[in-house]
C-alpha cells in the first residue's frame, strides 16, 4: 500500500494538524495505512512516539498497528537522508514497545494502577475477565439484597409490600427471574454511561417526568400517521376518477364520506386532539370493496387499490397502519389512568437498582476484582477530581488518536474529552460500519461530529476517504445501489449520497468496465414446505441453502480458487454445526471461526456433567443411571433392570445398588457373578471419586476420571474425536477457572452449570488445530476488518432479532426508563370477568417513546451490518436466501409493487423486521439492481449433486489409468521416489518385528543391545499410562511438547522470503493456536535465524525448498536380520543442482555450548537416516545436514553436523 500513490484525501489525513480532525474512512480505503503514516510523519517532525495517545478497538488491532509501525519506521529510516530525522526514527523504534498503543481498557487500567490512592483501591486489583466469576458474585449480591427486602428489614428504602409489588410487575408467580433480568439490564446500561450513579439518579425517571399523557408525546409519534392519511386520501381520490371505485354504489358513498372528513381528521392529528381523531375515524366505515374487472388494466388497478388499502387501513382482525395508530391512542387513553401507579413502581425500581449497583461495587472492592467498566469509571474519577493529573496528561500528549471511532461509547468519549486539550483529536472511523450497538457503542457521537465538522464555519476538519482499494467495481456498484436507496436520516441515521458512495480505487488489479461473471449473485432456494420442516421464525437455515452455496463453492475450488479465499458469513453461529457437516459432505475443508455450538449439549460433556452430578449426589437417579449406562461403565438395559428389581419402585437407585452388592435385595438371584463383579468395580471407583471431592480440585478430579476410565481416549476415536476431546478439556478448564476465582465445591459448580443450561446459555467454544486452507465460516460482526475474494452471505431471509422491543424495560440515555406495567383492570367499565382480577400488561408512555427510538436505531444498525458484510468481498458476492413454494406472500410476487419514494425505498419495506432478503428483493423490483438471480429447487440441487458424486465410466477410467502409468514410467522424479517407496518385504518370517518404525524408534533400538531376537516386541510411540501422578492431571500449563509442536507448525507455514515481524505475526495469528500456546512462540527470536548466513540462504532459496518432507525407506534389523520400513518426516531440505541441504528444527532447551554438543549427538542418527533417504531418492552423493536450534535463551543457533 505504501508504494501506491496517495490520494489527495489520504495526503490530507496524513499531514493536516492543529485542529480536531475526523476521518470518515469508507470500507477498504486504507485507514490503517493512513493512521500509521500519520504517526511516522509525526515522528519525522520531531514528536516522540510516546507523546502520542493511540487508542484501538481491540488488542489484536493494537498489535497489528504496532507491527506495521515497526515496518514503516524502519523503511522511513532507510529512505531518510536527514541524519537528525533518522535518529528520531531510530528512537521511535526503540520506544515503540512502550508507546501508548492499545485499547482504552488497557490505558484506564494503567492510569488507575498508577493513581490507585486517588480512588481508594488496592493497586493489585485484578480484572473479572471470566464471565462466570462476575455472574456468581453478581448473583450472590442480588440474592442477598432481595432476601433483605423480602424479610422486611428496618432501614430499607422500600417496604416489603411495595417491594413485592415491584417484583410482581416483572416476574411470573413466585419466580423472580424476570425481575432479576430487568435489574441486570439496567445495571449493564448504566455501566456504559460515564457516571452510572449520576445517570440513575438524574436521568432514570426522565421519561416519566416528560411523558405523562398522549399530548406530551413528540411529533414523531403522529408524523407517520399523518403521512399515511395523506396517502390514503390520495388513493381514494385517484380511485374515484380512474374507475377503480364504481360510479354508483356503497363503495363510492363510503369513499366520499371519508374525503368529506379529510380536513377534520388532519386537523385533529396536527393539534394532537387524539380523542377527536379516534372518535371520528371509528365512526366512518372504511370497508370499501371494489370487486374485479374483465378489463386487464382495470383489474390490475383494483388489485393494487385493495393491497394499498389493506396496508394503510386494514380491518379489525388485521389492522393496517392507521388502525394500529388508533389502537395506540385507545391504549394511551387507558394508560393515562395508571400513570401514577407506574411512576411509583419506577421510583422503587430506581431505588433498588442504585442500592444493587453500590452493593455490587462494594463487594468487588472487597474481592479486589473489578469489571472493565469499573476501571473506566475510576479513571474518569481520577481525571475529573484531580486537575494536576489531568493537566499533566494533557501536556504530555501532543495528539489523541482514536481508531474505529464510530464504535465509541460515552464512557470512552468522556475519557477522550478529559485527555484532549480541545484541538488535538484525530478520529478515524466509518459511521456505515458502526455495528456494536449491543455493546452500547453510540454511533451518534460520530454522526454529531460528522455533521458539525462538515459546516464551513466549523474550525475542525472533516476528511472523507471514499476510494476503495479492496473490491472490484461490480461489488462497489451493487453496494452503492443498495444503500443509496435504503439509507436516509429517518432510517439509517444518515443519507448515503455522493459523498458517502464507494469509489473504485484499485484499477491496476481490477478492470473499470463491469464483467457480468462478477456481478453479485442472489441464490434463492425455493423450499417445498412439505419436504422440509419450516421454522416460522426462519432463524434456522435450511439444508437447501447450504447445499446451494456448497455447490457454488465446489465450482470455485475446481476452477482453482483456494478455499482460504472464500468466506461464509452468517447472522449467528447457531447454524455452524449444520454448515460444517454439509460442507464436509462435499469434501470442502471448512473452519468455524467461532466454533461449533451447543458445547454443553454435546454428548461427551453431558455424560461428564451427569458423572459430576452423581458424585455430588448419588441419590439423583437420573444422573446416576445415565453414568452407569454411559461408556464409562457400560451397564446395559438388562443389567440395570436386574438392579432395579432389588427394591420397591420408590426406592432410590443408589440404595438398590447397595442391596445388589450385599445380596439383600428382593431378587438377589438376578445378580449373577458377572454383574456382581461389574458392580464391585463400579462401587470401588465411584466411592474413590466421592472421597476425593473434598481433597482435590474439580479440574484434577475430571482428569482422573478421564484417564482412569479411558473416556478421553474413547471419545477421541469417535467421529470428530479431536473436537470431542477439546470439549472435555474445555470443561476441565472451566472448572479450573471457577475454582481459581475463589469458589470451591462440586455442588456450586454443578449448580452453576445447571443454571447455564436452564437459561440456554453456552460456554466458550474450543479451539483445535485447523486446516491452513479452508473456507471460513463466521458471523457478520466477526468479519469486520477482514477481506476475502469470494463472500457468501447466508440465511438472508432470517428475520431481524426484535426481542429487545418486547422486553419489560427499554432504556434510552435521554429518557431513562421505559417499562411495561401490569395493571388490574377489574374496575374498568367495559371489562367483564368472573375472576377476582383482570391483569393486563401495558406499555407506558416512556416505553412507547423508547421503543420507537430503539426500533429505528436497530433497523439502522442492521443496514450497517449489511454494509459491512457486502464490503468484505474483493471479487464476488453471493447472497443466499430462501422463498417458500407454497406461500406466495413469502415469494417473489410480494415485491411486484415495490417502488421508490423519491430516491428511497418505500417505508413499508424499509421499516420492517423481515430481514435483509426483504430489502434486497424490494429494491430489485424497484430499481433493477446489477445482480444475477438464481432460483433453485431441491430436485435441481440433487441433480447437480450427482455431477459431483456420479459413478465414473470404468472403461474410460482404465484407459486414462494406462495413459497415466505410461507417463509415470518415464518420469525421472517418480522413478527416484519409487526406489524408496516400492521396496517389498522379501521375508515373511519377521512377524515379531514392528514392520514400520520411526527414526526415533530406530535410534532407540541402536542402543538396546541387550534385546534378543525372540524378545523383540512391536513398539508404539504412545504408551498408555493407567495411573497418572495426581499433580500431572490435565493440561494446567502449556507443555514444552505443545510449544515445540506449535513452533514446528509455524516454521512450516512461515514464508521465509518475507522474514519480518509483520508477516510472521500475521501468519501466527492465522494459524488458530490457543492464546497460551501462541504467546510462547517467540517471533523476535525466530527472526534472528535470518540474521545468520544460513537464514539468508533459506530466504534466497524459497523456490527450491521442500518443507515437511515425508519419506519411507527399507532397512534391515541388525538383530532379527529381517527388513522393515522406516517412515518419517524431515522438517525440510533445499534441493540444489549438485547437492541437498537438509535442515531440521529442534526446540530442546539449552544454555551452554556443551548442551549444544549434546543435542547434536542426540539427533545425529536421526539426521543420518534423513540423509540416507534423500540420497537414495534423488540419487545425490552429498547431503549437508544442519540443526536449527530454537531452544536457546535469546537467539537461534544453526549447527552443521559432520558425516
From Swiss-Prot:
Gene Ontology biological process terms in this record: double-strand break repair via homologous recombination
Residues of the UvrD-like helicase C-terminal domain: 503-785
All residue ranges annotated as the UvrD-like helicase ATP-binding domain in the record: 4-472
PROSITE patterns hit by this protein: UVRD_HELICASE_ATP_BIND (PS51198), UVRD_HELICASE_CTER (PS51217)
Superkingdom of origin organism: Bacteria
Binding site for ATP: 25-32
Family annotation (Gene3D superfamilies): 1.10.10.160, 3.90.320.10, P-loop containing nucleotide triphosphate hydrolases (3.40.50.300), PCRA, domain 4 (1.10.486.10)
Cofactor: Mg(2+)
One annotated GO molecular function: ATP hydrolysis activity
Protein EC: 3.1.-.-, 5.6.2.4
The family this protein is said to belong to: Belongs to the helicase family. AddA subfamily.
Role noted for this protein: The heterodimer acts as both an ATP-dependent DNA helicase and an ATP-dependent, dual-direction single-stranded exonuclease. Recognizes the chi site generating a DNA molecule suitable for the initiation of homologous recombination. The AddA nuclease domain is required for chi fragment generation; this subunit has the helicase and 3' -> 5' nuclease activities.
Protein name listed in UniProt: ATP-dependent helicase/nuclease subunit A
Amino acid at each position: 500500500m505504501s508504494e501506491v500513490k496517495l490520494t489527495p484525501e489520504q495526503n490530507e489525513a496524513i499531514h493536516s494538524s492543529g485542529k480536531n480532525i475526523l476521518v470518515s474512512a469508507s470500507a477498504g480505503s486504507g485507514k490503517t495505512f493512513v493512521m500509521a503514516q500519520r504517526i511516522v510523519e509525526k515522528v519525522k517532525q520531531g514528536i516522540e512516539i510516546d507523546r502520542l495517545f493511540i487508542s484501538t478497538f481491540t488488542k489484536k488491532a493494537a498489535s497489528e498497528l504496532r507491527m506495521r509501525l515497526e515496518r514503516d519506521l524502519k523503511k522511513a529510516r532507510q529512505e531518510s537522508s536527514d541524519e537528525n530525522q533518522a535518529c528520531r526514527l531510530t528512537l521511535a523504534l526503540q520506544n515503540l514497545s512502550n508507546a501508548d498503543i492499545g485499547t482504552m481498557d488497557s490505558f484506564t487500567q494503567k492510569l488507575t494502577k498508577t493513581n490507585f490512592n486517588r480512588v481508594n483501591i488496592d493497586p493489585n486489583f485484578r480484572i473479572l475477565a471470566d464471565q462466570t466469576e462476575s455472574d456468581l458474585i453478581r448473583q450472590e449480591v442480588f440474592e442477598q439484597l432481595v432476601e433483605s427486602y423480602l424479610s422486611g428489614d428496618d432501614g430499607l428504602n422500600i417496604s416489603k409490600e411495595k417491594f413485592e409489588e415491584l417484583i410482581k410487575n416483572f416476574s411470573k408467580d413466585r419466580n423472580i427471574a424476570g425481575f432479576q433480568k430487568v435489574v441486570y439490564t439496567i445495571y449493564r446500561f448504566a455501566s456504559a454511561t460515564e457516571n452510572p450513579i449520576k445517570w440513575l439518579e438524574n436521568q432514570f425517571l426522565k421519561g416519566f417526568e416528560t411523558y405523562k399523557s398522549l399530548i406530551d408525546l413528540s411529533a414523531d409519534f403522529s408524523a407517520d400517521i399523518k403521512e399515511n392519511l395523506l396517502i390514503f386520501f390520495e388513493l381514494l381520490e385517484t380511485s374515484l376518477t380512474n374507475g377503480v371505485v364504481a360510479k354508483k354504489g356503497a363503495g363510492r358513498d363510503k369513499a366520499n364520506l371519508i374525503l368529506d372528513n379529510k380536513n377534520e381528521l388532519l386537523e385533529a392529528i396536527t393539534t394532537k386532539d387524539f380523542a377527536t381523531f379516534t372518535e371520528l375515524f371509528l365512526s366512518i366505515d372504511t370497508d370499501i370493496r371494489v370487486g374485479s374487472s374483465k378489463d386487464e388494466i382495470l383489474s390490475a388497478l383494483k388489485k393494487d387499490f385493495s393491497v394499498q388499502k389493506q396496508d394503510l387501513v386494514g380491518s379489525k382482525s388485521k389492522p393496517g397502519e392507521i388502525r394500529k395508530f388508533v389502537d395506540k391512542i385507545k391504549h394511551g387513553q387507558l394508560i393515562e389512568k395508571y400513570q401514577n401507579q407506574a411512576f411509583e413502581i419506577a421510583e422503587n425500581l430506581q431505588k433498588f437498582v442504585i442500592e444493587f449497583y453500590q452493593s455490587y461495587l462494594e463487594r468487588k472492592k472487597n474481592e479486589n476484582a473489578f469489571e472493565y467498566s469499573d476501571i473506566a469509571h475510576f479513571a474518569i474519577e481520577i481525571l475529573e477530581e484531580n486537575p494536576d493529573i489531568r493537566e499533566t496528561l494533557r501536556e504530555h500528549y501532543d495528539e489523541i488518536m482514536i481508531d474505529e471511532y464510530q464504535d465509541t461509547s460515552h464512557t470512552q468519549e468522556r475519557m477522550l474529552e478529559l485527555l484532549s486539550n480541545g484541538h488535538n483529536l484525530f478520529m478515524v472511523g466509518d459511521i456505515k460500519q458502526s455495528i456494536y450497538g449491543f455493546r452500547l457503542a453510540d454511533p451518534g457521537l460520530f454522526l454529531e461530529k460528522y455533521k458539525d465538522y462538515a459546516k464551513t464555519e466549523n474550525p475542525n476538519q472533516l476528511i472523507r476517504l471514499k476510494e476503495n482499494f479492496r473490491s472490484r467495481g461490480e461489488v462497489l456498484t451493487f453496494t452503492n445501489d443498495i444503500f443509496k436507496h435504503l439509507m436516509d436520516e429517518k432510517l439509517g441515521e444518515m443519507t448515503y449520497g455522493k459523498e458517502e458512495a464507494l469509489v473504485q480505487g484499485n484499477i491496476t488489479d481490477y478492470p473499470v468496465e463491469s464483467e457480468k461473471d462478477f456481478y453479485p449473485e442472489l441464490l434463492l432456494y425455493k423450499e417445498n414446505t412439505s419436504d422440509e420442516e419450516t421454522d416460522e421464525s426462519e432463524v434456522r437455515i435450511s439444508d437447501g441453502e447450504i447445499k446451494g452455496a456448497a455447490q457454488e463453492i465446489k465450482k470455485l475450488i475446481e476452477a482453482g480458487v483456494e478455499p482460504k479465499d472464500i468466506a461464509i458469513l452468517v447472522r449467528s453461529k447457531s447454524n455452524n454445526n449444520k454448515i460444517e457437516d454439509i460442507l464436509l459432505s462435499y469434501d470442502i475443508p471448512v473452519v468455524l471461526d467461532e466454533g461449533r455450538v451447543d458445547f454443553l449439549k454435546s454428548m461427551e460433556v453431558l455424560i461428564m456433567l451427569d458423572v459430576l452430578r452423581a458424585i455430588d449426589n448419588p441419590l439423583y437417579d437420573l444422573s446416576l443411571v445415565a453414568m452407569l449406562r454411559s461408556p464409562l461403565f457400560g451397564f446395559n438395559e438388562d443389567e440395570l433392570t436386574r438392579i432395579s428389581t432389588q427394591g420397591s419402585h420408590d426406592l432410590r437407585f443408589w440404595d438398590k445398588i447397595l442391596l445388589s452388592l450385599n445380596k439383600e435385595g428382593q431378587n438377589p438371584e438376578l445378580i449373577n457373578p458377572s454383574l456382581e463383579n461389574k458392580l464391585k468395580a463400579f462401587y470401588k471407583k465411584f466411592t474413590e471419586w466421592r472421597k476425593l471431592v473434598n481433597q482435590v480440585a474439580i479440574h484434577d478430579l475430571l482428569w482422573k476420571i478421564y484417564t482412569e476410565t479411558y473416556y478421553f481416549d474413547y471419545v477421541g476415536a469417535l467421529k470428530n474425536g479431536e473436537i470431542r476431546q477439546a470439549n472435555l478439556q474445555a470443561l476441565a478448564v472451566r472448572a479450573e477457572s471457577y475454582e481459581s476465582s475463589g469458589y470451591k465445591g462440586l455442588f456450586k459448580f454443578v449448580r452453576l452449570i445447571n443454571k447455564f443450561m436452564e437459561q440456554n446459555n453456552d460456554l466458550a467454544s474450543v479451539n483445535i488445530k485447523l486446516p491452513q486452507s479452508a473456507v471460513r465460516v463466521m458471523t457478520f460482526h466477526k468479519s469486520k476488518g477482514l477481506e476475502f475474494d469470494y463472500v457468501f452471505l447466508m440465511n438472508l431471509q432470517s428475520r431481524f432479532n426484535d426481542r429487545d422491543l418486547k422486553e419489560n424495560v427499554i432504556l434510552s440515555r435521554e429518557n431513562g426508563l421505559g417499562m411495561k406495567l401490569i395493571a388490574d383492570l377489574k374496575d374498568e367499565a367495559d371489562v367483564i370477568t368472573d375472576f377476582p382480577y383482570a391483569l393486563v400488561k401495558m406499555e407506558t408512555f416512556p416505553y412507547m417513546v423508547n421503543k420507537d427510538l430503539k426500533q429505528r436505531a436497530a433497523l439502522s444498525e442492521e443496514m450497517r451490518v449489511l454494509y459491512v458484510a457486502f464490503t468484505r468481498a474483493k471479487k464476488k458476492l453471493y447472497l443466499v436466501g430462501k422463498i417458500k413454494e407454497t406461500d406466495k406472500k413469502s415469494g417473489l410476487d410480494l415485491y411486484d409493487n415495490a417502488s421508490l419514494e423519491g430516491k428511497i425505498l418505500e417505508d413499508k419495506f424499509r421499516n420492517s423486521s423481515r430481514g435483509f432478503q426483504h430489502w434486497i428483493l424490494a429494491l430489485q423490483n424497484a430499481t433493477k439492481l446489477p445482480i444475477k438471480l438464481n432460483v433453485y429447487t431441491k430436485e435441481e440441487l440433487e441433480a447437480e449433486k450427482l455431477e459431483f458424486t456420479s459413478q465414473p465410466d470404468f472403461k474410460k477410467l482404465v484407459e486414462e489409468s494406462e495413459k497415466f502409468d505410461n507417463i509415470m514410467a518415464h518420469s525421472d522424479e517418480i522413478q527416484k521416489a519409487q526406489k524408496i517407496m516400492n521396496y517389498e518385504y522379501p521375508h515373511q518370517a519377521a512377524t515379531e518385528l514392528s514392520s514400520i518404525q520411526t527414526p526415533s524408534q530406530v535410534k532407540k533400538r541402536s542402543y538396546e543391545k541387550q534385546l534378543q531376537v525372540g524378545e523383540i516386541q512391536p513398539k508404539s510411540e504412545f504408551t498408555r499410562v493407567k495411573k497418572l501422578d495426581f499433580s500431572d492431571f490435565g493440561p494446567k500449563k502449556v507443555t514444552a511438547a505443545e510449544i515445540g509442536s506449535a513452533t514446528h507448525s509455524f516454521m512450516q507455514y512461515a514464508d521465509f522470503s518475507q522474514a519480518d515481524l509483520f508477516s510472521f505475526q500475521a501468519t501466527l495469528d492465522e494459524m488458530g493456536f490457543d492464546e497460551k500456546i501462541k504467546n510462547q512462540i517467540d517471533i523476535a527470536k525466530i527472526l534472528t535465524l535470518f540474521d545468520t548466513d544460513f537464514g539468508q540462504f533459506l530466504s534466497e532459496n524459497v523456490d527450491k525448498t521442500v518443507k515437511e518432507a515425508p519419506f519411507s525407506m527399507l532397512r534391515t534389523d541388525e538383530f532379527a536380520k529381517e527388513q522393515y520400513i522406516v517412515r518419517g518426516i524431515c522438517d525440510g531440505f533445499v534441493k540444489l543442482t549438485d547437492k541437498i541441504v537438509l535442515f531440521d528444527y529442534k526446540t530442546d532447551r539449552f544454555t551452554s555450548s556443551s548442551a549444544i554438543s549434546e543435542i547434536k549427538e542426540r539427533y545425529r542418527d536421526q539426521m543420518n537416516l534423513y540423509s540416507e533417504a534423500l540420497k537414495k531418492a534423488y540419487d545425490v552423493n552429498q547431503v549437508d545436514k544442519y540443526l536449527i536450534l530454537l531452544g536457546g535463551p535469546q537467539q537461534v543457533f544453526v549447527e552443521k553436523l559432520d558425516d
